[in-house]
């Protein structure tokens, strides 16, 4: 991931820098190939997106993978500059417009993703992150989504304040950290002609796989990930509850000490002696540091994503079950005649 710095002006309204992303078919194939190659090694695939901005459309025309983090001799920033310089020499779009990464079972939202996109978006205003879900795509559903940080999330990360008060002030929740940008895939006319010719050469699909109900592993993976995220959120809730208990105990002791001081000052006043200022008592109780809620917010977003995927998967499975039952009943009725 790139580590970029920059300035970003606060914008309370929605981000209208990019309305949609148009991705070239060749760039999509490169991303898909790279992500599937790395998924076999259980590694996270990441790479740079190249293209240009036309009006409100971000056109992605090329991409290249980042070097693996295990190679300590590789300077990642120098590697990216070298690749873009060589692409420029051969008259290929070389402008950096974002980055992409692979995802497994919908586990795309993370602290690392938020941090990297913040550095990108504050230095390259129109940059996006494209997330490719390898497991869902391997089942026949191309899952390619583009995201940008919302202005509120950028301001929160810029301030470095992740307390509950900051989340309430900026009205930031897990659903408003990222904004999904519509993405379309465009091919050249020659590519479309070639795809039409190849489609005629493919054998006709009888459609048996569409009613396949043996997909328990998919639901199992989603449920396992969901249980892990719920456990993490529970641990975060326990930590925050302990913080609230400590703060409540400290406030109780401080009020008791102030009440005692007020009584002592009343006695001193009646005797004509100088009173002790309240600051002497208050400074004995240092305010407790408020725990950051960013991790809990991200975990909540992951739980919401898994719940949506499970609901979608179950609805599709139920639809397959009813269709299969109807076809089976029709087949049995036909055989009895």
Curated annotation (Swiss-Prot):
Cellular compartments per GO CC: eukaryotic 43S preinitiation complex; eukaryotic 48S preinitiation complex; eukaryotic translation initiation factor 3 complex
Keyword hit for Cytoplasm: yes
Superkingdom assignment: Eukaryota
CDD domains the record matches: MPN_eIF3h (cd08065)
Localisation: Cytoplasm
Keyword terms, alphabetized: Cytoplasm, Initiation factor, Protein biosynthesis
InterPro entries linked to this entry: eIF3h (IPR027524), eIF3h_C (IPR045810), JAMM/MPN+_dom (IPR000555), JAMM_MPN+_peptidase_M67A (IPR050242), MPN (IPR037518)
One Pfam family this sequence matches: JAB
Single Gene Ontology MF annotation: translation initiation factor activity
Keyword Cytoplasm: yes
Domain MPN: 21-153
GO biological process per UniProt: formation of cytoplasmic translation initiation complex; positive regulation of Notch signaling pathway
SMART domains hit by this protein: JAB_MPN
Record text on subunit structure and interactions: Component of the eukaryotic translation initiation factor 3 (eIF-3) complex. The eIF-3 complex interacts with pix. Interacts with mxt.
Free-text function comment from the UniProt entry: Component of the eukaryotic translation initiation factor 3 (eIF-3) complex, which is involved in protein synthesis of a specialized repertoire of mRNAs and, together with other initiation factors, stimulates binding of mRNA and methionyl-tRNAi to the 40S ribosome. The eIF-3 complex specifically targets and initiates translation of a subset of mRNAs involved in cell proliferation.
Family, per entry: Belongs to the eIF-3 subunit H family.
Protein name: Eukaryotic translation initiation factor 3 subunit H
Species in which this protein is naturally found: Drosophila ananassae (Fruit fly)
Organism lineage: Eukaryota, Metazoa, Ecdysozoa, Arthropoda, Hexapoda
Gene that this sequence comes from: eIF-3p40
